[in-house]
A protein has these predicted regions:
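A shared catalytic/ligand-binding motif for oxyanion handling
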Residues: 1-132
Length: 132
């Protein structure tokens, strides 16, 4: 997802809320250029967009997978920041591991973000009618 820094972040939050509502929080993984900064996702500072997003994520029980790194998710001639987020719901929280910002060169001013996903297997227990 892309959150345009020229638009109100609340509009983007509404989009995420719709995704969460329609998915019923099952198996959602969102990779987003949020154009929002927060120390919660290991940026050097928190801006107003970041504060709004922090409150939303806390209230909706969605989780940020970003971890501390010597690399940043965004860099250009003006500086560096961590504005790209990987977000998930409680169901997938333990299934996504090895989150890392790659130091591999690419043509974008955004870094490559890598992670591993372990499949979630639903266990179905059927009642055996012979045990009654």
């Amino acid at each position: 997802m892309y959150f345009d820094r020229e638009h109100q972040i609340e509009d983007d939050i509404v989009r995420i809320e719709l995704i969460l509502h329609h998915s019923k929080y099952t198996g959602i993984l969102i990779a987003a250029d949020c154009n929002a900064r927060s120390t919660l996702w290991h940026d050097k500072l928190t801006n107003s967009r970041g504060r709004i997003l922090e409150v939303f994520m806390t209230n909706k029980q969605v989780f940020i997978l970003n971890v501390q790194s010597s690399n940043t998710t965004f860099r250009n001639r003006l500086g560096t920041s961590n504005i790209d987020l990987t977000i998930t719901c409680p169901r997938l929280l333990n299934s996504i591991t090895e989150w890392a910002i790659s130091d591999q060169e690419n043509v974008s001013d955004h870094s490559i973000i890598k992670y591993a996903i372990t499949p979630v297997i639903a266990k179905v227990y059927a009642e055996n009618p012979l045990n009654k």
